[in-house]
Swiss-Prot record:
Keywords: Aminopeptidase, Glycoprotein, Hydrolase, Protease, Secreted, Serine protease, Signal, Virulence
Principal localisation: secreted
pH-dependence of activity, as noted: Optimum pH is 6.7 to 7.0.
Annotated Gene3D superfamilies: alpha/beta hydrolase (3.40.50.1820), Dipeptidylpeptidase IV, N-terminal domain (2.140.10.30)
GO BP term, pick one: proteolysis
Protein localization: Secreted
Cellular component GO terms, alphabetical: extracellular region; plasma membrane
S-S bridge residues: none
Glycosylation (residues): N35, N78, N101, N110, N169, N218, N465, N490, N665
Protein name (Swiss-Prot/TrEMBL): Probable dipeptidyl peptidase 4
Catalytic-site annotation from UniProt: S613, D690, H725
Origin superkingdom: Eukaryota
Reaction(s) catalysed by this chain's protein: Release of an N-terminal dipeptide, Xaa-Yaa-|-Zaa-, from a polypeptide, preferentially when Yaa is Pro, provided Zaa is neither Pro nor hydroxyproline
Length: 765
């Protein structure tokens, strides 16, 4: 086993860290309990997220205080003014958006959740002088899907019944009329929301507010999947379940088609814009961005069906002519949709306009400047590390602020880079292990710097070019004080060397009052999906994993291992799992368990593995290896066969079923020997109302196992009525963790040769 040693080197060139470079272990005697970690998060750091606004003074933001009042505060002077008093806030308000000149507030009320990001609501416009409220749509009934101010504030675009409307001066124009169950205008359908856009809207105003670009999705021909709801939010079940008919394209099935539309607000003229980057049936639009300061150019980032080819198509709004200005081939793996395109404008003396984007075309995700007119891009950053986020673009100072893994893949430090000189400057001490983020004011003169771990998070306010904080925004002093009463598990990080020479990041959590002379059971907690990351030096929530390391009757070590295919270690590390999901990931988890078993403080006979979603799938693939390295498996909401999952996620990593039939067969969980032989058995948990990873996955897997003769001693199954992928309906979440705790306790106490019922004894069969 190869262990990496973290060396802390002093640095005086950037902001110092007033916390320790490791997770806290507490200084008291109390142990965390189940109720404090699962039923409620008794000790949880807080952080503010501000909505910066443009006023005459940089540094103003809007927030809603504890009594419900909407207020504007200067983060510099702390001066506060009330925009809407609490008694004037509409009843059942869910969210709000401020008019650009602060004259009005757009409120969402009567919230009803739909999918991961989407919801329905009523919307009201409130004049801040008179405090009068007027409905966005007079006959609304909690059925508006999205609404957004234009940048100039003279219009609101909104979506209702899958149609786009524009409100101006109390007058509403309906822009589309064909919206319905199969046609979506301005909002994504289920698969685009979940897998491509990662949001609930699909419309974008031009910077000057003169045009609106929106996407139109056509689900005609997309197969329907039925999700039954047995209780349907009632205390007594109805005689017949409600059935959700969800257009859900699975592998190699028909995908929705997508079309770009442009609306000129002055004339009300709407124009469909053909994007011929790929065949219409193959086309995926991953991103739409205005590459202009006004409304001259709108660009589309287009992918082919399996997302291993990419084209950026720029549309000249005046002529409606389109041109491919950038192209990528990613057939060595896949191309991620990072949603990071942003307009920069002319650079230096040149009149040529550029936009910025994150691309891994060098093998590592970095910042690139691309000409809006097309041509060779310019690399702003380079090296064997990755840019993870663009936080702010400061055009007057010609700077881009970003987060990266420059120090280590498990860390995030804050930097700026000049697009004039390409000089990279750390804003924090990047030699100290940490995870940071930042939020910049509207004019870029100030920023809230958020320390996110490994110690207790906090937030400070800084002025640009200053290394001394103006003040502390969030100290989390209450958390620091609370931790003085507890003794906490000890979290450490190291790297594990594979025989190939590659390394895996590992996060180890040692039990409270750990003794190297004792032997402890271990729980592996992988996610392991493509591009994901679980091993991070961010603050680790005091959750279930902290509980099982604290309970004196459990005292589990936990190992979280980021296997090959996970993120932030370069394209080659990610893409080697392409077309063969489950193979390398499982091999890496087994290898890590075998190395853990050699440690003197590990009980090698009791090493369990538990994962949720992709982690549940990976747990199944690990058990399927029949390696003997793990003694118990728990699969929560797992995929069991990639033919059952949605096309846009699955084909990105596995290609189509027709082109990779052998890969799909190998990736499915079908081998039962490991399930028969795993010493402590397997627990499978799934919600029947899961609209993401369908219950079908667990049902088919259980049928395979039962049909192949896996015995009741080896297999336990738990469904959760009407629960979605998060398993929370009617107390499901607490039950799930109690059940998991029980299985871990039983596994710890399990003897290798216990008594069994006669049907388990081969001699009497």
């Amino acid at each position: 086993m190869k262990w990496s040693i973290l060396l802390l080197v002093g640095c005086a060139a950037a902001i110092d860290v007033p916390r320790q470079p490791y997770a806290p272990t507490g200084s008291g005697k109390k142990r965390l309990t189940f109720n404090e970690t699962v039923v409620k998060r008794a000790i949880s750091p807080s952080a503010i997220s501000v909505e910066w606004i443009s006023t005459s003074e940089d540094g103003d933001y809007v927030y809603q205080d504890q009594d419900g009042s909407l207020k504007i505060q200067s983060i510099v002077t702390n001066h506060t003014q009330t925009l809407v008093p609490a008694d004037k806030v509409p009843e059942d308000a869910y969210s709000y958006w401020i008019h650009p000149n602060l004259s009005s507030v757009l409120w969402a009320t009567n919230y009803t959740k739909q999918y991961r990001y989407s919801y329905f609501a009523d919307y009201f416009i409130q004049d801040v002088q008179s405090m009068k409220l007027r409905p966005l749509a007079p006959d609304q009934s909690g059925d508006i899907q999205y609404a957004q101010w234009s940048p100039t504030g003279d219009a609101i675009a909104f979506v209702r019944d899958n149609n786009v409307f524009v409100w101006t001066n109390a007058s509403t124009s309906q822009i589309t009329n064909d919206g319905g169950p199969d046609l979506f205008n301005g909002v994504p359908d289920w698969i685009y929301e979940e897998e491509i856009l990662g949001d609930r809207f699909a419309l974008w105003f031009s910077p000057d507010g003169a045009y609106l670009a929106f996407l139109r999705f056509n689900e005609t021909g997309v197969p329907t999947f039925t999700v039954p709801y047995y209780m349907d939010n009632e205390e007594i079940a109805p005689p017949y379940p409600r059935e959700l008919e969800l257009r859900y394209p699975k592998v190699s099935q028909t995908n929705p088609t997508v079309e770009l539309n442009l609306l000129e607000l002055r004339t009300g003229e709407r124009t469909p814009v053909p994007i011929d980057a790929f065949d219409a049936k193959e086309l995926i639009i991953g991103e739409v961005a205005w590459l202009t300061g006004k409304h001259d150019v709108v660009a589309v980032k287009a992918f082919n069906r399996v997302q291993d080819r990419q084209k950026v198509v720029a549309v000249d709004v005046a002529s409606l002519r389109s041109k491919t200005i950038s192209e990528r081939d990613g057939t060595d793996g896949w191309l991620d949709n990072l949603l990071s395109m942003a307009y920069i404008g002319p650079i230096g003396e040149s009149k040529e306009e550029y936009y910025i984007d994150i691309s891994d075309q060098s093998g590592w995700a970095h910042l690139w400047l691309f000409p809006v007119a097309g041509g060779e891009p310019i690399a702003l950053t380079k090296g064997e590390w990755e840019v993870t986020n663009i936080l702010s673009i400061d055009k007057p100072r010609q700077l881009v602020y970003f987060l990266s893994t420059k120090h280590h893949s498990t860390e995030r430090h804050l930097y700026s880079v000049s697009w004039k000189t390409k000089e990279i400057t750390p804003l924090v001490d990047d030699t100290v292990p940490a995870v940071w983020s930042a939020s910049f004011s509207s004019q870029g003169g100030y920023y809230i710097l958020s320390y996110r771990g490994p110690d207790v998070p906090y937030q400070d306010l800084y002025a640009i070019n200053s290394t001394a904080p103006l003040r502390t925004i969030t100290s989390n002093a209450a958390v620091l004080n609370a931790l003085k009463e507890y003794t906490l598990p000890n979290i450490t990080y190291f790297e594990l060397a594979l025989p190939s020479g590659e390394t895996l990041n590992v996060m180890q959590r040692l039990p409270v009052k750990f003794s190297p002379k004792k032997k402890y059971p271990v729980l592996f907690t992988p996610y392991g999906g493509p591009g994901a990351q679980e091993v991070s030096k961010a603050w680790q929530a005091l959750d279930f994993k902290a509980y099982i390391a604290s309970d004196p009757e459990l005292e589990y070590i936990t190992w979280t291992v980021d296997n090959r295919g996970t993120g932030y270690k370069g394209r080659a590390f990610r893409c080697q799992v392409a077309s063969r999901l489950g193979e390398l990931e499982a091999a890496d988890q087994v290898f890590a368990a075998q190395q853990a078993a050699k440690l003197p403080y590990v009980d090698a006979q009791h090493i369990a593995i538990w994962g949720w979603s992709y982690g549940g799938y990976l747990t199944g693939k690990v058990i399927e290896t029949d390696s003997g390295a793990f003694s118990l498996g728990v699969q929560t909401a797992p995929v069991s066969d990639w033919r059952f999952y949605d096309s846009m996620y699955t084909e990105r990593y596995m290609k189509t079923l027709e082109s990779n039939a052998a890969g799909y067969n190998a990736s499915a969980i079908r081998k039962v020997a490991g399930y028969k032989n795993v010493r402590g058995g397997v627990l499978i948990q799934h919600g029947t109302g899961d609209d993401n990873v369908h219950f079908q996955n667990a049902a088919a897997l259980v049928d395979t196992l039962v049909g192949a003769g896996v015995t009741p001693e080896k297999l336990q199954v738990q469904w959760f009525t009407d629960s979605d992928h998060g398993i929370r309906y009617h107390g499901g979440n607490v039950f799930l963790y109690r059940q998991l705790s029980k299985r871990l306790y039983e596994e710890k106490k399990r003897k290798e040769k216990g008594e069994a019922h006669q049907w388990s004894k081969k001699s009497v069969l």
